[in-house]
Amino acid sequence: MTPIFFNQQYPTLVDICARWQLVYDANATFELRFESDTLSLHKRDEPKLDGIVVDFVTGAVAHRRKFGGGRGQSIAKAVGLKQGVMPSVVDGTAGLGRDAFVLASLGCTVTMVERHPVVAALLEDGLRRAYQDAEIGDWMRERMRLFHGSSLEALSKLALEVDVVYLDPMYPHRDKSALVKKEMRVFQSLVGADLDADGLLAPALALATKRVVVKRPDYAEDLDGVKPNTVIETKKNRFDVYVKAAMK
């Protein structure tokens, strides 16, 4: 059970917290609010910080969908997206779902796995609103879903056919931009860095039939010390690609 502060008089919040096994704690560092049909996370000792929400419909995520470079994006190349090839993807470290959304918007079917229940609750709420949206709702319902389990091992028991497993473990950020600082400060204080991230590679390789893609900061070492087959570099990050079989 994960401690969280919330308004116990609000049935919607009570239901969400019960669903994700979040237990009320008057002294919890974090608060969940439900306002304007949106679930948001707040750090109670930093009231000036905006709440964190998952929003697939507006803002930066929507802008990237419309103007982000389509299949030419490095992430699309990394997962093997090309003409006639729409791989099924498991995002094993979904976070706020941004990379998963990019892949879904390009045609992949994406199953998100998120082990922290507060983050999973935010994801589920973002999906709920996206599914109802007139512009993106139809394909979102077809292509993007949240797995109600906290690990790749749990997912593997469903015996899904998965082409690609995508991993973006939380790594201590050096970036000083205001947005990254704000979101990452709240996020990292909630979930912490993925100190056991090296343990993700083996189950990912067991689950994926075609490849595993690991997003890393450019200064980070290889995950679990395993050298990738190929690396796609961007300005600040790189995608390490572990190939098991050709994309068809």
Swiss-Prot record:
EC assignment: 2.1.1.242
InterPro entries: 16SrRNA_methylTrfase_J, SAM-dependent_MTases_sf
Family: Belongs to the methyltransferase superfamily. RsmJ family.
One Pfam family in the UniProt entry: SAM_MT
Keyword Transferase in record: yes
Residues that, per the record, bind S-adenosyl-L-methionine: R98, D99, E114, R115, S150, S151, D168
Catalytic activity: guanosine(1516) in 16S rRNA + S-adenosyl-L-methionine = N(2)-methylguanosine(1516) in 16S rRNA + S-adenosyl-L-homocysteine + H(+)
Disulfide bonds: none
Gene name for this UniProt entry: rsmJ
Superkingdom of origin: Bacteria
Keywords: Cytoplasm, Methyltransferase, rRNA processing, S-adenosyl-L-methionine, Transferase
A GO CC annotation given for this chain: cytoplasm
Subcellular location: Cytoplasm
A single GO molecular function term of this UniProt record: rRNA (guanine-N2-)-methyltransferase activity
Function: Specifically methylates the guanosine in position 1516 of 16S rRNA.
Enzyme class, first EC level, given as a word: transferase
Protein name listed in UniProt: Ribosomal RNA small subunit methyltransferase J
Spans traversing the lipid bilayer: none
Lineage: Bacteria, Pseudomonadati, Pseudomonadota, Gammaproteobacteria, Alteromonadales
